């Protein structure tokens, strides 16, 4: 449904980027959307590949795909769908589909979920946090949900 809808659009935005900075652990993400602001949101959120990385790492595709067709409602005839919104992530197929929601944060939450699934398998503890490093090398961690001021705290630190 989402792919058919996206294929019917005259203009699509495709954003390739990495989730994570470490070259050994980062995940290649490809976002396909019809909304410019969704593309800009993910362009700012993901680590931008260099032209060389884009040509090499993404030429064969990405590790995970996000198909954002938020303009169209979900089909309530599909088992498990109970409303007009459906945000589905299949970790085996490595695909996320967004239907019926214009909220750009759905994509971010999907990437968080992917990383929260993958990183413990590599021995890493994923955290939704930010930090400040003091003059003596001491570190303060700030934990919180989206929009609770973690970035604001480090900006004034």
Predicted regions and their residues:
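A noncatalytic interaction/capping subdomain that flanks phosphate/NTP-handling catalytic cores
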Residues: 1-139
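Glycine-rich phosphate-binding P-loop
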Residues: 133-157
């Amino acid at each position: 449904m989402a792919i058919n809808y996206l294929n019917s659009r005259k203009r699509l935005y495709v954003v390739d980027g990495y989730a994570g900075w470490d070259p050994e652990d980062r995940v290649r993400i490809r976002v396909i959307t019809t909304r410019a602001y969704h593309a800009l949101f993910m362009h700012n959120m993901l680590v931008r590949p260099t032209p060389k990385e884009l040509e090499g790492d993404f030429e064969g595709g990405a590790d995970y795909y996000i198909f954002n067709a938020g303009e169209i409602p979900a089909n309530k005839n599909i088992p498990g769908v109970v409303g007009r919104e459906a945000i589905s992530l299949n970790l085996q197929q490595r695909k996320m589909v967004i239907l019926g929601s214009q909220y750009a944060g759905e994509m971010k939450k999907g990437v968080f979920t992917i990383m929260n699934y993958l990183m413990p398998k590599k021995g890493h503890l994923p955290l939704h946090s930010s930090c400040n490093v003091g003059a003596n090398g001491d570190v303060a961690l700030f934990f919180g949900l989206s929009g609770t001021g973690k970035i604001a705290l480090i900006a004034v630190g």
